[in-house]
């Protein structure tokens, strides 16, 4: 038998973190002993035993940060309701191949529907899809230089998609490994890339654990967003949400009516109030369709206009100096790099400001008394 070599590669082989709460609770039911956190060496040993490798040679080139040096990391802090605004803002403001990660299939489906209504041409990818459809969406994503793929962690590993410029974590990943592998879809083959972590208040705990595991002593820098441009996206997203709700209601009503009519026909039943109910149903359906048509017309009217206006604004001159609107050459990574470069300068300027010592209330009274005596 010829000699055979087996190689095992991973960006997170030596990464260790605290045991997730759900796993700790599950283990407590079966054992009373406390679960010990593995060291990197112990973790590697267990992997070698599972794989069945004899006399392994370990080469660890993992960096402390866990991510590539040419990857720019940042975050957006917002409420859960505003995530859609920020995501749509980013997609419309910065062109390029973008991969959006979600924690659940339900979230992927919702975003794909919403962004589809907004004409962003999203391509969903999750485990519930047929393999043929998954491969088809991946091919479409690779063929479009401004492609948008919305996926679960099924796309976080094992995929080498060239020239992915942006990775957006729509939800904070539950583990540090997921964050590293998701972010690793960009900044590949010595190319630059940017990863944006969207964080709501309830996800702060997962964010803190992520920073702790990756050895981050400081928060990820904030991605710059022009507030007045963000406001322009809100109206579109809100109308798209309403359209989504109306379409869902129409589908449910049609499904319910179809099932009821089919059951009545199969059992040869005659409903006394059939005509009255039918008239009421038709009126309700007509109302829903009218509302849906009205909202679609309203959205189409907004979509026909320029989202981010060109030119100089006299009301907000400082905004125009800092951010050029509708600049096709403007890249998200360049904007973020500029912000990161300015952070030390701003801190230095802040430290240079003279500290004004405020006099206490008692000192003021004494000074007043002394003036009166004079």
What are the residue ranges of the model-derived segments?
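Conserved interdomain hinge at the start of the Helicase C-terminal
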Residues: 65-117
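Conserved helicase motor "Helicase C" RecA-like lobe of SF1/SF2 P-loop NTPases
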Residues: 103-137
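Loop/turn-to-beta-strand initiation segments
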Residues: 2-7, 97, 121, 144-148
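Conserved two-lobed SF2 helicase motor
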Residues: 138-157
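A short beta-strand-to-loop transition that corresponds to the Sensor-1 phosphate-sensing loop
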Residues: 8-13, 62, 102-105, 152-154, ...
